[in-house]
Amino acid sequence: MNHRRSSIVLLILSILSPVTLSIRYELLSGHTKCISEEIHANAMTIGKYSIINPHEDHPLPSSHKVTVRVTSPQGTAYHESDGVESGQFSFVAVETGDYISCFSAVDHKPETTLIIDFDWRTGIHTKDWSNVAKKSQVETMEFEVKKLFETVNGIHDEMFYLRDREEEMHNLNIATNSKMAWLSFVSLAVCLSVAGLQFWHLKTFFQKKKLI
């Protein structure tokens, strides 16, 4: 029970606290890098990516192109772009699991280093609250209530997700314990059989030697 409460508290803190949603990394030409994100079913996800221009006063060179592929845990492609400098994707996850975004830089000689800026948001983080406030011009209190409502919905969905994961782990533990019990029984039976065979062999040996 205490462990469950701790998990819920950590979940609430992770949702309410600020998170870093943008990453920037280097990618060598001819190489591929993949980033995975655990997303649960029915969650909205949005991604934006772009190649940083090393020379702002000039257009990106032809070597600065990437192929992007976003796939589900079962391998379903949600986004594919070939030879692009930037792009974006959005979808609602159908299944729960690790979704993978892979970036492949075009092969180029001499080898070039690309800097990729990637922003991947999931769940309530797909909401851009600053734009919502500017576009609707709502009162401060109404805006805060709406934001809190969305946060509560996110917590609600995450709690159901954790409950399902906990149930899966519980069923897995039961199945594992059953297999271990069966394996222990088989091991005991094998040991007793071997001991019986050894006893019979020794008895036969001593009888032949007329020691018993």
Curated annotation (Swiss-Prot):
Residues 23-179 are lumenal. It comes from the Eukaryota. InterPro entries: Emp24-like (IPR015720), GOLD_dom (IPR009038). It is found in: Endoplasmic reticulum membrane; Golgi apparatus, cis-Golgi network membrane; Golgi apparatus, Golgi stack membrane. Residues 162-175 form a coiled coil. Residues 201-212 are cytoplasmic. The keyword Transport applies. A motif (COPII vesicle coat-binding) lies at residues 205-206. Residues 1-22 form the signal peptide. GO terms for biological process: protein transport; vesicle-mediated transport. The keyword Endoplasmic reticulum applies. The modification Omega-N-methylated arginine is found at R165. It is a single-pass type I membrane protein. PROSITE patterns: GOLD (PS50866). Involved in vesicular protein trafficking. Mainly functions in the early secretory pathway. Thought to act as cargo receptor at the lumenal side for incorporation of secretory cargo molecules into transport vesicles and to be involved in vesicle coat formation at the cytoplasmic side. Probably oligomerizes with other members of the EMP24/GP25L family. Associates with the COPI vesicle coat (coatomer). Associates with the COPII vesicle coat (coatomer). This is Transmembrane emp24 domain-containing protein p24delta7.
